[in-house]
Amino acid sequence: MKKVIFLVMIAAIGFNMTASAQKAINSVHFYDVKNTDMEKTYIASLKEINTIMAEMGFPKNYYSYFKLAASDTTKTYRNCTIGHWTSEQDYKTIHDHPKFKAWANKNKDINAVFVAGQMYRKMYAAD
């Protein structure tokens, strides 16, 4: 499990090549999705907020969704969402924006299932 978490976090940092390494950050959320219907709803929610962030003027900031292979026997934290942020300031501006807050409020019942039991980390470039 530790290897999986480490590899996903390294991959998250590697995926964010849209900003300088000194400024870019990633938010990493590990959680469990209980069924495929919930997964589909959650993915649709992420697509919606990615579109909203682009409309707000932040097209290089977005969420990606990952899951372990079906053959992986890990019992917990089988799913992961990675937020890709060009800077700490952009992260704050986006999360404070009325459109982001409206999306979060609209989806709070859907996303609360994942947030309640998640392991969350905000990762910064090491160099």
PLM region spans:
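Short S/T/G/P-rich N-terminal loop/turn motif that feeds into the first structured element of a domain
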Residues: 6, 15-101, 114-127
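Positively charged n-region of N-terminal signal peptides that target proteins for export
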Residues: 1-4
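Short, exposed beta-strand-loop hairpins at the edges of beta-sheets
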Residues: 106-115
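Repetitive helical segments and hydrophobic/amphipathic motifs
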Residues: 11-12
